[in-house]
């Protein structure tokens, strides 16, 4: 590394340590408004992007080496972390598409046709600039750096005239805490450099400055707990820089979650959030049962729901008369004592001697998704029921037939009129009643949840170790996002990811082959018939996973040990299967036997099925 780079890194390290030592912000800096400071940071980021563009050009023509280019990228990323909390809050779609989205191909829809769009932004550059073949990709790196520079200028121009309210700033701060924990500390955000902890520190330091500016603005002169928590968080991040050994659980309980609650207390009273998100700003913990709004994902609204609607939905859920044969109900494949799965590799068909093509996933916390089924073919809970009703191997029925049956049942007629006084029995209300019951199947009171919220003093050390592995070295948390531990993407929690793992048809066979199920590619949605979705399946929750064996869409893995071994070798690629579009990293994780057992201990600590002895 050249001397000027070492010198600059020394200056940056000293500045960061000033934060870590809890030194107070100078009075003249306190007098700046948050907007003025944010504008300063945005301008700094734009300048850094210009410098990165010049460095990428120099790298392409051999004027600087890869280490110099990496240094410039890290500086640009550090600058972004100081404006990230606001820009990703105010402009989430633009930020995801152009500034810091995941380095994965995605589609844009033109009419009904899918167009595959390559990713751009800081994460893609992080992956490419730190790759062994960076020189071979120098032309593409330059193109991406040029695009990033242009995007930064565009957003800066729009941001100049944007006013900020205190509620927006506080929500942006709290959402950044979620982002730091779920995307930053997990390494999701830094796929090539692994510079996760330093970037988390930069983002946290900026939140601390903004907090003091807000306190000055509101004339809060008393020593607030938020200052102490920020100081402690920065010190901890500064003194614990090893990614694999970083104690994320201690950081969550000791600093981040208390800060999340404290900043809520400092938020303006009575202010109404304008966010289009399932995140509930009034929640006090990342692991509280009100962290997300389940009604965000359903056509049924909270004002329509109630005990009578839920009771009606429960009765319908367990009523076999909804199926044409009168022998199958929703509860046939989703059994309460097995966390609403059925324990079979693939569920039993209504046709004797046959099975359905896929495993029955749990319905506990299933509401927290914008897409349903393994292939994501349904967009709401209500649509999910519709697919089961029409499926010839399941209910093999139709709404008209079901409504006719129910209309001849006096108890059902009365129940619908009581639950839905304005319209009574109809197709829409039938779907809403079923959705109400499924929506009620929520569980956030596992031993781990209680410990994370500080409601219990201790938990098995193996569980702690497993959580830190899950969110760190094992990289589970980069696809199974906290706190749902599914593919519901933080911090807005409005859309689900699907992944291509290369799941084999029979993992224990000597000659293994890929499962033939095409997944999302064949979900009947024409605009998703793209190669990037071949054999792509929804990332389901690992909550209550101890009760839902066997695993994956085809139920081919019998135990959690089998599942972890599969991930440890790098998925289907680790079996030397031809998975040309695998999204799971193919590099082995190198987990020890103890680490594997720790992961299992953590996942078992997520067990919480209050409906196990349900009264039908």
Regions found by a protein language model. Give the residues of each.
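Sec/Tat-exported extracytoplasmic proteins
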Residues: 49, 53-63, 73, 77-87, ...
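Post-cleavage N-terminal segment of exported redox proteins
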Residues: 9-29, 232-309, 396, 400, ...
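Extracytoplasmic redox metalloprotein regions
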Residues: 84, 97-163, 167-168, 315, ...
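Mature extracytoplasmic or organellar-lumen-exposed domains after removal of signal/transit peptides
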Residues: 27-291
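Amphipathic alpha-helical interaction segments
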Residues: 68-71, 75, 429-436, 598
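Short glycine/threonine-rich turn/loop motifs
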Residues: 282-387, 452-557, 562-565, 574-576, ...
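N-terminal secretory signal peptides that target proteins for export/translocation
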Residues: 1-5
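Extracellular low-complexity, Gly/Ser/Thr-rich intrinsically disordered linkers
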Residues: 544, 551, 556-610
